Regions:
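Residue-level hotspots at or immediately adjacent to binding/recognition sites across diverse folds
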Residues: 4, 22-375
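Secretory targeting and sorting signals
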Residues: 1-27
Length: 375
């Protein structure tokens, strides 16, 4: 889920390349809630949380199979039911009403985008005429979903589903055979990728749609992989990878493209309404201002790297600090960093991170195979 952010808030952070002291670390240890697992299951993980505290993610059942799940605001877990044709499903987001969104699949390549409604019922999102499969990738608070659909010949068209589940195909660049919508903002603006020949590096077009109208944001020479991580109003963030597979982070202000300085170890996860992007620059959690300045965020003592993974409407962020072991963290809008506790020491190789933060500052994540919530 992407959230529109109305203001840029000054984070008391370390300037990239400077020796200024970092923001203070919050010493008070916050509470942690273990969200639990399905009956008989042993593992769970979160993906997203809405502002009412509804959480979605996955959990293993008693047979060890991964299932999509939703926790209500009282932290009660429920398995999300599969459509009759489906054999498995994944969930990626939740809207303001508590509806969960994901994808289901079954035999013979059957695959459909799906919404799990707040009342527990399941809605398979519409299939555009002439297409055989669908996949959803992003949703906004209003329940508008974007993704793509496949034809029999395996060409791909970008799709937007409204809150009723009705599908609209979005145009690609001229002659496009593969087009995918990958991000949507709260105003309904959409961004993604469109290409004529999937194996031609110079033909990977970054695109956006406003009220369904296509804008070609151009290509990056030598690009072997293109993706969009977010859109917020006039700003789009994305990634390109050259032959060496390093990752270069990009931002568009309207149609004007800029690249994060510092080489090919950069990733962006979120962008606010003023164009400040958040993610990882040079292995450190950072924000990249609309003016082009990279500002490194403070880390807990003993940690040298990390990444911002989520942003809320008030400028608070969440993510992970990295050393020999990973540590979920939350940054306030003023730049204070808090190391988020977890119930028992997980193995060093287990997944440990904060995956989302809602507009009330509540963070969800995972440590040691357990879904966790930090109020």
């Amino acid at each position: 889920m992407r959230r529109a952010v109305g203001t840029v808030l000054a984070l008391g952070l370390v300037m990239w390349g400077s020796v200024a002291p970092g923001a203070p670390v919050v010493n008070a240890e916050p509470a942690v809630v273990d969200l639990g697992t399905l009956p008989g299951g042993s593992e769970s993980s979160t993906v997203a949380i809405n502002d009412d505290g509804v959480v979605v993610g996955r959990a293993k059942d008693a047979q060890g199979l991964s299932r999509p799940v939703r926790w209500d605001a009282d932290h009660r877990i429920a398995e999300l039911p599969l459509p009759p044709q489906a054999r498995y499903a994944t969930v990626f987001g939740v809207d303001a009403s508590g509806a969960a969104f994901g994808n289901t699949g079954g035999p013979d390549g059957w695959e459909r985008a799906v919404r799990w409604n707040p009342d527990g019922s399941t809605t398979v999102l519409d299939l555009p005429p002439g297409h055989t499969r669908t996949r959803a990738l992003a949703v906004n608070d209003g329940g508008t979903v974007v993704g793509h659909a496949y034809t029999v010949g395996q060409s791909q068209v970008a799709v937007r589903w409204d809150a009723s589940g009705a599908a609209t195909a979005l145009p690609g660049v001229e002659g496009a055979r593969w087009t995918e919508a990958q991000a949507i903002d709260e105003g309904g603006a959409v961004a993604g990728i469109s290409t004529v020949e999937h194996d031609l590096s110079d033909d990977l077009h970054y695109v956006r749609w406003d009220d369904g109208a296509l804008t070609d944001l151009g290509t990056v020479p030598g690009n072997t992989h293109a993706s969009v991580q977010g859109i917020n109003g006039r700003y789009v963030i994305g990634t390109h990878r050259p032959v060496d597979r390093s990752g270069y982070a990009l931002r568009w202000d309207g149609s004007e493209r800029a690249e994060v300085p510092g080489g090919g170890t950069n990733r962006l996860a979120e962008v606010d309404a003023e164009g400040t992007a958040f993610g990882m620059v040079g292995g450190r959690p950072a924000r990249w201002t609309a003016g082009g300045e990279v500002v490194v965020q403070a880390l807990p003592e003993g940690y040298g790297s990390g990444q911002v993974l989520a942003l809320n409407a008030h400028g608070a962020t969440a993510g992970v600090a990295i050393s020999a072991q990973r540590q979920p963290v939350r940054w306030s809008a003023s730049g204070e960093v808090t190391a988020l506790p977890f119930p028992s020491p997980p193995s060093p190789r287990s997944a440990i991170f904060a995956s989302d933060v809602n507009d009330r500052g509540v963070v969800v994540g995972e440590a040691g195979g357990r879904a966790l919530l930090w109020p």
